[in-house]
Swiss-Prot record:
Gene this chain is encoded by: araB
GO CC annotation: cytoplasm
One GO biological process term: L-arabinose catabolic process to xylulose 5-phosphate
Enzyme Commission number(s): 2.7.1.16
GO molecular function: ATP binding; D-ribulokinase activity; ribulokinase activity
UniProt source species: Staphylococcus epidermidis (strain ATCC 12228 / FDA PCI 1200)
The protein, known as: Ribulokinase
Catalytic activity: D-ribulose + ATP = D-ribulose 5-phosphate + ADP + H(+); L-ribulose + ATP = L-ribulose 5-phosphate + ADP + H(+)
InterPro entries: ATPase_NBD (IPR043129), Carb_kinase_FGGY (IPR000577), FGGY_C (IPR018485), FGGY_N (IPR018484), Ribulokinase (IPR005929)
Alphabetical UniProt keywords: Arabinose catabolism, ATP-binding, Carbohydrate metabolism, Kinase, Nucleotide-binding, Transferase
Pfam families: FGGY_C, FGGY_N
Superkingdom in the source lineage: Bacteria
Pathway membership, UniProt: Carbohydrate degradation; L-arabinose degradation via L-ribulose; D-xylulose 5-phosphate from L-arabinose (bacterial route): step 2/3
Length: 536
């Protein structure tokens, strides 16, 4: 009998699980919101610019230390039977550290400087830097495997943002890294990087390394910054990042033989958690945002796909990533905008407002739907890679009920996913089955039904809202030698299927006109006249 620990750092909260390595059964689970939340409107009563999303690294350490202690005590397992620890984290969430590995926001003279804080993945303050990087890559092949684009959420644009907006922060930062790398470095008392984070978000290749020619063309200082502050030993997924350091051995009472995995991006960890580890399996990790992931034995350049990295999920395979930056956040926004009569009716039925909205929306026939939404309320990641784009609603009349708008929000996220899927299929990477992971698919059968019919694919919903945490635990089990390969760990520890939604041919056909309208509006406001979206 052996156990592994999976630590999952999400957008607003963190989770820690203790899992049985033989079958993936979750024995104990801890979850807590980040104590300081996300700074997005103000910091120490000073207003923040639009699209700023900052966090406090101390919250991560609180989750780490309290969470692991809790699951060990709650489970009452023999601590000597814990063999490994895995970590997943949102990305690209960037942290700036001093010589002592302390976050710069802990410095008294920097605590009111927003650039000293962790830049959360959805921080979009670096769009100008991302645009300039795209401009400097014209007529080059530097971005072939990044969808010929650069996203403002990634590491390098965020570093350039700090160089331009707060050069003193860059001067005082000794280390710049993904927050996931910060956690694993602390756990192992070393300075290491994961190939998953640095490959997808830092323009690093497992054969060529960092693209310093590209960096120099963007800013002559950038190669030096990356070499001095970002370079470190890079560990691939499936390998051990090292043993748990003595300090944490003593704090938690764990064995000196406990191994730590390099961190994996949270959505990528969800692929492991659902067991979608074969070619042709398309995983949509649906949470506050959606990350779309596929594996293939080949690396091919795909326009508008946000990256492909070898060994980033399963050793020997290329992982492909795309995404939508507002899905759960979009539904939450819709709930908060619901008119009073909807809220009152939900209360009368003793139902959460979101559940009641979906109940009403489920009675709208596809043929009755006359509202189409561009779901860009937090910009667009794939396939346009433009965080300046804003959302739009088309087809409103004085008779439009609010639940029709809510249904259109759900449909828009499905249409966006279909556009992303088409990019893969047009490049000879076929999609056979869609796995829906994250908390939302289990809660919303309407969403799953809409996705199956819009995509015209079988959608498999996994019976776990802990897929990312479980994927991290699989990594811990693998490096802790409970399994000889990560693939074996994933197949043995994956969670069971909750249900399968098959597409219904009549509804598949009914959605085609709506999808066509979405595509026309998408190209009109996203490609031909994006400035109109900026003005809205």
């Amino acid at each position: 009998m052996s156990y592994s620990i999976g630590i999952d750092f999400g957008t607003a909260s963190g989770r820690v699980i203790l899992a049985d390595t033989s079958n993936g059964h979750i024995i104990s689970r801890y979850e807590e919101d980040y104590a300081n939340g996300t700074y997005m409107n103000s910091l120490y009563d000073k207003p923040l610019p639009e699209n700023y999303f900052l966090q406090n690294a101390d919250d991560y350490l609180q989750i780490l230390e309290q969470g692991v202690q809790f699951v060990l005590e709650d489970s009452k397992v023999n601590k000597n039977d814990v063999v490994g620890i895995g970590v997943d984290f949102t990305s690209s969430t960037i942290i700036f550290l001093d010589e002592q590995f302390e976050p710069l926001h802990r410095h008294e003279d920097l605590k009111t400087n927003p650039h000293a804080y962790v830049k959360l993945w959805k921080h979009h303050g670096a769009q100008d830097e991302a645009n300039y990087m795209i401009q400097m890559s014209k007529n080059k092949n530097w971005l072939d495997y990044y969808g010929s684009s650069v996203n403002s959420e990634w590491m390098i644009p965020k570093i350039l943002e700090v160089k331009h907006e707060a050069p003193e922060i860059l001067r005082r930062a000794r280390y710049i890294m993904e927050a996931g790398d910060y956690i694993t470095s602390i756990l192992t008392n070393s300075n290491i990087r994961s190939n998953c984070g640095i490959g997808f978000k830092g323009f690093w290749d497992n054969e060529a390394g960092f693209n310093y020619d590209f960096f120099h063309s963007v800013d002559p200082d950038l190669p030096k910054i990356v070499k001095e502050k970002c370079e470190a030993p890079i560990i691939s997924i499936g390998e051990s990042a090292g043993r748990l350091c003595k300090d944490y051995q003593q704090i938690w009472g764990l064995s000196q033989d406990v191994q730590v995995s390099p961190f994996i991006i949270d959505a990528h960890s969800g692929v492991l958690g659902v067991g979608a580890i074969e070619a042709g399996e398309f995983t949509a990790v649906i949470g506050t945002s959606t990350c779309h992931l596929m594996l293939d034995s080949r690396q091919v350049p795909i326009s508008s796909i946000t990256g492909s990295v070898k060994n980033a999920i399963i050793p020997g395979l290329y992982a492909y990533e795309a995404g939508q930056p507002a899905v759960g956040d979009l539904f939450e926004y819709s709930k908060n905008q619901a008119p009073k009569h909807i809220v009152d009716q939900a209360n009368e039925h003793h139902m959460p407002v979101l559940n009641y909205l979906e109940e009403l929306a489920s009675h709208i026939r596809i043929e009755e739907q006359h509202v189409v939404v561009l779901d860009w309320l937090n910009g667009n990641r794939s396939i346009l890679s433009n965080s300046h784009l804003t959302g739009s609603i088309f087809g409103l009349t004085l008779q439009t009920p609010y639940e029709m708008i809510h249904r259109a929000y759900i449909e828009a996220t499905a249409f966006g996913t279909k556009l992303i899927m088409k990019q893969f299929e047009d490049n000879h990477i076929p999609v056979h089955t869609v796995y829906a992971s994250g908390g939302i698919p289990q809660k919303s059968k309407l969403l799953v039904e809409i996705y199956a019919n819009v995509l015209n694919k079988r959608v498999v919903v996994i019976d776990s809202s802990n897929a990312s945490a479980l994927g991290a635990a699989m990594l811990g089990a693998n490096v802790g030698n409970a399994y000889s390969t990560l693939k074996e760990a994933a197949l043995s520890m994956k969670q069971p299927i909750a249900y399968i939604q098959e597409p219904e041919i009549q509804k598949v056909q009914a959605y085609k006109p709506l999808y066509h309208k979405y595509c026309e509006l998408h190209d009109l406001l996203g490609r031909q006249y994006p400035e109109l979206s900026y003005l809205i």
